C-alpha cells in the first residue's frame, strides 16, 4: 500500500506519497494479505465458499477476517492513534479480493464503516450471495462507496461489464452514495490502482467534516 519495497507483489499503491503530496488529513492503517503459494488470500478475503475452475474449492473465511478487523484491529488503532472512531470517519478499502471484502464490510457492518472503496472487486466469487446481501442489509444513512474496474481486466469483458453494471444498479437502488467508474485502459494491477487514488480519496473525503 505504502512503499514498493514492502509490497506483497513488488508494487504498492504509493499511498504515503499521495497523502503527503495532497496533504490529505487521513490515517491509513494497512494489513498484509496472506500471499502463500496455495492462494490462502482467496480464503481469508472471501466471505463465502466458492469453487474456481482454475484454483479449485475454497472455504471462505472472510467473515472471520472481518470480525478481526472490527473487534481487534480497529480498536487497537483507535486506542493508539488520534482517530475519529465514529462510522462517518471510518473507511475501508481494497482491490481485487480486498475490494470484495471492502464492499462486504460496508454492507455487513454499516454501523462501523461509513465509506468504502472497492477497486476491481472480485464480484465473480459469489454473485448470488452478494446480491442477496445488498438487498437485505441494514444500511445507515450517509453510506458512501467508490467502486471501479479497468476496461482491460481479465478475459470476459462483456460478462464483467454486465455483472458490474447490475451490481452497481442494485447498490444504487439501496440509497448508497455510489461513485462507479470503468477505467479506460485500466487493468488488474497495483500500478493501475495507484492511478485511481485521486478519484478514490475525492469520494471518501467528499463533504466530510
Where are these regions (language model features)?
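Non-catalytic cap/lid and distal C-terminal segments of serine-dependent acyl enzymes
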Residues: 1-209
Amino acid at each position: 500500500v505504502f512503499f514498493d519495497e514492502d509490497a506483497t507483489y513488488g508494487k504498492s499503491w504509493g499511498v504515503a506519497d499521495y497523502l503527503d503530496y495532497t496533504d490529505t488529513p487521513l490515517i491509513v492503517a494497512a494489513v498484509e494479505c496472506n500471499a502463500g503459494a496455495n492462494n490462502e488470500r482467496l480464503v481469508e478475503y472471501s466471505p463465502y465458499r466458492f469453487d474456481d475452475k482454475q484454483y479449485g474449492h475454497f472455504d471462505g473465511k472472510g467473515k472471520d477476517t472481518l470480525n478481526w478487523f472490527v473487534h481487534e484491529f480497529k480498536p487497537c488503532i483507535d486506542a493508539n492513534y488520534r482517530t475519529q472512531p465514529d462510522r462517518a470517519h471510518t473507511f475501508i478499502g481494497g482491490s481485487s479480493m480486498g475490494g470484495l471484502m471492502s464492499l462486504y464490510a460496508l454492507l455487513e457492518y454499516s454501523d462501523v464503516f461509513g465509506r468504502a472503496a472497492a477497486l476491481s472487486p472480485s464480484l465473480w466469487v459469489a454473485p448470488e450471495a452478494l446480491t442477496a446481501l445488498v438487498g437485505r442489509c441494514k444500511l445507515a444513512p450517509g453510506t458512501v462507496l467508490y467502486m471501479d474496474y479497468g476496461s482491460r481486466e481479465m478475459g470476459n469483458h462483456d460478462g464483467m461489464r454486465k455483472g458490474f453494471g447490475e451490481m452497481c444498479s442494485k447498490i444504487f437502488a439501496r440509497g448508497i452514495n455510489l461513485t462507479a467508474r470503468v477505467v479506460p485502459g485500466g487493468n488488474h494491477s497495483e500500478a493501475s490502482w495507484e492511478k485511481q487514488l485521486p478519484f478514490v480519496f475525492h469520494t471518501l473525503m467528499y463533504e466530510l467534516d
